UniProtKB/Swiss-Prot annotation:
NCBIfam families: lspA
Pfam families the record matches: Peptidase_A8 (PF01252)
Cell membrane recorded as keyword: yes
Superkingdom field: Bacteria
GO terms of biological process kind: proteolysis
Function: This protein specifically catalyzes the removal of signal peptides from prolipoproteins.
Protein name: Lipoprotein signal peptidase
Gene Ontology terms, MF aspect: aspartic-type endopeptidase activity
PANTHER family: LIPOPROTEIN SIGNAL PEPTIDASE (PTHR33695:SF1)
EC number: 3.4.23.36
Transmembrane stretches, start-end: 15-35, 47-67, 72-92, 107-127, 141-161
Length: 171
């Protein structure tokens, strides 16, 4: 059976439930943060000696990339997220559902991307709340969606190394 003749049930689109779960968890956490935490550094909750909960607005991309710009980046990142989501969904449609590693990676990225797009469209910014630091250095605040995007991307990169190792050597 060729990949193009897979039924929806046989294809990787079966894994979109994971993207939906990530999206729902991300939006739920962000709503809880917005409704229950004061905005900004003064209202942080110190959890561990290297970790705070901190409600901030991110007008840029992951880890505040381009957040200091004048607003054009909101639509750029929204457009990129739509293109990437469409591309990954297309690849999931062509992959068998049994290719768990890649389908999980794609679903994590899709769920995170859609969560951040939702924020950009509804609020005009992305809600970030995780603040890790060492001494006086603080990693830019981020959220669950950013985390799942990074995990999915790391899985794709790792899969590239795995695929190279399992390929037969040519003489």
């Amino acid at each position: 059976m060729s990949n193009s003749s897979l039924t929806l049930k046989q294809s990787g689109l079966r894994w979109l439930w994971l993207a939906l779960l990530v999206f729902i968890a991300d939006i739920t956490i962000k709503l809880i943060v917005m409704d229950n935490m004061g905005y900004g550094w003064a209202n942080r909750i110190e959890v561990l000696p290297f970790f705070n909960l901190l409600y901030v607005h991110n007008y840029g991309a992951a880890f505040s990339f381009l957040s200091d710009q004048e607003g054009w980046q909101r639509w750029l990142f929204t457009g990129i997220a739509f293109v990437v989501t469409g591309m990954l969904a297309y690849w999931m449609r062509r992959l068998p559902a049994s290719d768990k590693w890649n389908n999980i990676a794609y679903a994590l990225i899709i769920g995170g991307a859609v969560g951040n797009v939702f924020d950009r469209i509804v609020h005009g910014f992305v809600v970030d709340y995780l603040d890790f630091y060492w001494g006086t250095y603080h990693w830019p605040a981020f959220n669950l969606a950013d985390s799942t995007i990074c995990i999915g991307a790391a899985m794709i990169i790792l899969d590239g190394f795995r695929a190279k190792k399992s390929a037969p050597s040519q003489s």
